[in-house]
A protein has these predicted regions:
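A "functional boundary" signal
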Residues: 4-5, 10, 16-196
Length: 196
């Protein structure tokens, strides 16, 4: 009888532990599903996760990155402390795609805070990783640098990057992006005095 009770107790505890892990993963997944739909829903699901510091490295990285994005979209202000947690964790667990995206978000945060040296340093660190980026990530990567050089009045560097962005855009049918990219290129040329 005592042995049966211990076995049942162990099974109950085991199911609770695995149930918590499953529910954490489900909440993270639901938060991801709410991206671009509802920031409040993202935050709601993330707030349901109990003890985020006790998650696995992968789950903690996902949690911090989701919380970073939700906070950014809600407040329009980046929260670097969350990126400082998730970037090394993504690298540690081998999630290159998320690591790259978090690094790009870090560069964007530097842009928001008007830290051009930090932006260009981040860009140099990612230079050999562009082959792993999606075309959208590459556009993001080059645009951040382009606007940094533009703000520093380094127009030849900005123009090179504007041309790279346009080359990435041409195969797509995204006419709004093409419009903005051409407009930026023309603005750079105007600043250089080459608008003929």
């Amino acid at each position: 009888m005592k042995k049966s009770f211990l076995i049942i107790l162990c099974l109950a505890l085991l199911s609770c532990v695995t149930g918590c892990k499953d529910s954490t993963q489900t909440l993270l997944k639901k938060s991801v599903e709410m991206e671009g739909i509802s920031t409040d829903s993202m935050l709601f699901y993330l707030q349901q996760i109990q003890s985020p510091n006790h998650l696995s490295d992968k789950q903690r990285a996902e949690y911090c990155f989701q919380l970073y994005k939700a906070t950014l979209w809600k407040t329009q202000k980046p929260k670097d402390s969350l990126l400082k947690v998730c970037i090394p964790l993504f690298l540690h667990v081998g999630d290159t795609a998320q690591w790259l995206q978090a690094q790009l978000e870090q560069a964007n945060s530097f842009f928001y805070k008007d830290q051009p040296d930090s932006i260009l340093h981040s860009a140099r660190e990612l230079r050999d990783k562009t082959k792993y980026m999606t075309p959208t990530q590459q556009r993001y990567y080059y645009n951040i640098q382009k606007f940094t050089y533009f703000n520093q009045k380094k127009y030849p560097e900005a123009l090179k990057l504007a041309n790279k962005v346009l080359a990435l855009n041409n195969p797509s049918n995204d006419t709004l992006s093409l419009f903005y990219d051409h407009r930026t290129q023309l603005e750079i040329l105007r600043k250089m005095g080459k608008t003929d």
